[in-house]
Regions:
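N-terminal Rossmann-like dinucleotide-binding module
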Residues: 1-45, 49
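N-terminal glycine-rich "phosphate-gripper" loop used for MgATP/nucleotide binding
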Residues: 39-40, 63, 67, 81-97
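Short beta->alpha connector loops at strand-helix junctions that form conserved
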Residues: 58-63, 110
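Charge-dense, helix-prone N-terminal extensions
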Residues: 192-321
Length: 321
């Protein structure tokens, strides 16, 4: 079973979304642990709640500091806690580009509108003034542009005829408390999701020259060459033949390399029951910590072992430049 993801939450005030995430983390099947709650306001009410729940806290005021300097202080605290993801929960600071880059694809935010509508402030009144029938909230990845990152999930909230900004905000907040923990859990556990893992392999395998996908004994495999005479260079395996792991099968140069890999890192590599005797190696991908650059390298290496010479010659020539 994969280790739980480690997250840090940034707040500036009472932290109601923080509280929802904290209480969700108490469930035994929650895929994340909260390592730190940090704030730019030492008096933020949410810090007291986090402390009461035995969660480490950190605070450092931003006044008198450049945006970059304060972000670096926060970054250092997050890294020091061991967190792998940053969750913004009412953190009222525009983050520097450098901070955003450091946490690219590992930082989430929740926004009280159905993005891309109504980025920024006053979202409730803007939705009412526009005559919208529904408003809502969105969880998205954080990018350099405000409220512009890829949307991971949304919840619609009906706008009632007598709604004002406050009444609408109170119902959207309830939706936020449901949406944020659920979306966070889904996102941090995606690397253990077989469908997500398969798509990562597929994208990388099909990016190689003259490749195509074909089922083999019910499992997706990738071949190089023509439909009739192509050769397999990789397979996806999902707990087949009594094996417990989700993995990628690739070719090695032979028994010596296979044995060396198994001896050097038995937690990563294993001998597949079906093709192990043929010199193939399996790489575990359901640990939640897959190194996808490493996987790309293996796919390329395995591809070169079976690709037609005309293709490998082209690769060799290209590598000279």
């Amino acid at each position: 079973m994969a280790d739980k993801a480690k997250i840090a939450i940034l707040i500036s005030g009472r932290g109601s979304n923080m509280a929802a995430i904290i209480y969700a983390a108490k469930s035994s099947d929650c895929p994340y642990d909260i390592m730190l709650v940090a704030s730019n306001d030492p008096n933020a009410a949410g810090l007291k709640l986090a402390e009461a729940e035995n969660i480490a806290t950190f605070a450092h005021p931003h006044k008198g500091l450049s945006r970059e300097a304060h972000d670096q202080i926060m970054h250092d605290a997050i890294v020091g806690s061991g967190a792998e993801y940053v969750v913004l929960a009412g953190y009222m600071r525009i983050l520097s580009d450098g901070f955003v880059r450091k946490w690219a694809d590992h930082m989430l935010n929740i926004h009280p509108s159905l993005l891309p509508k109504y980025k920024g402030l006053d979202t409730y009144q803007r939705a009412i003034d526009a005559g919208d029938k529904v408003a809502g909230c969105s969880v998205h990845l954080v990018t350099a542009e405000l409220d512009d990152g890829p949307v991971l999930a949304q919840t619609e909230v009906a706008i009632l005829p007598d709604d004002d900004a406050d009444s609408l905000a109170s119902r959207i907040l309830i939706a936020e408390h449901q949406l944020y923990p659920a979306t966070l859990a889904q996102y941090v556990s995606r690397e253990c999701n077989p469908d997500w893992i398969l798509q990562q392999i597929r994208d990388r395998a099909l990016a190689l020259a003259e490749t195509h996908e074909r089922l083999s004994f019910g499992s997706p495999g990738w071949r190089v060459g023509g439909e009739k005479n192509g050769k397999y260079f990789a397979y996806f395996t999902q707990r087949l033949y009594g094996e417990e792991s989700i993995g990628l099968l690739v070719k090695t140069s032979g028994p010596d390399e296979q044995a060396a890999l198994l001896g050097a890192d038995p937690d990563l590599y294993y001998s597949p029951k079906f093709l192990g005797k043929s010199g193939w190696i399996a790489i575990r991908l359901d640990t939640g910590r897959a190194d996808w650059d490493h996987i790309s390298d293996w796919l390329g290496k395995s591809w070169q072992m079976v690709a037609p010479k005309r293709l490998t010659k082209m690769i060799a020539i290209a590598d000279q430049f």
